Amino acid sequence: EASLRRFAHYDYWDDKVRRSILVDSRADILTYGMGENILRRIAALLDKGVPIKKIQDVRGTVYLTSRDAKPHYEVAGAWDYDELKTDKRLYAEAFGVQYRNTDSITGKALVEYYDNKMLVQNPPMPPLEREELDAVYALPYMRRPHPCYDKDGGVPAIAEVEMSITHNR
């Protein structure tokens, strides 16, 4: 998941700290958390003609900008990738700050520097209100695997979860 790799992260396969997937993929924006309202807001801005590179104030998003830009939200912590990849203590401290800023009420923006670029994670999007959540679950979901799996006999693992209910989000 891109959201798990939105900051500098340890890669067990390579046995090293890698850059944010947003830097390596050269994507325009990354979303994290429950995406219903995030995507709705991004779509509304795109519909108004706002270029994707200018969408930098939506909560629950991560974007790259110039190193000297000013984030739209109060910043709780900022680190340089080149230091994070070589200093285990700093990496652990950064992770702690990231962890403490996952709450949509108290969470603040976070920053990582990559050469002349700045990666900004906006604070998390607030959870859906009851009416919004009801609307999501009222959508006409098929509640079955995609038909492309039918030719291979379906998805055996679906039997474990087909009668499950959402406990929390």
Explain the meaning of each model-derived region.
Residues E1-D115, L119-M125:
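Glycine-rich beta-alpha loop elements in corrinoid/cobalamin-binding modules
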Residues D28, N168-R169:
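Functional transmembrane helices that embed catalytic/metal-coordinating motifs
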Residues G96-H167:
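N-terminal [4Fe-4S]-dependent radical SAM core
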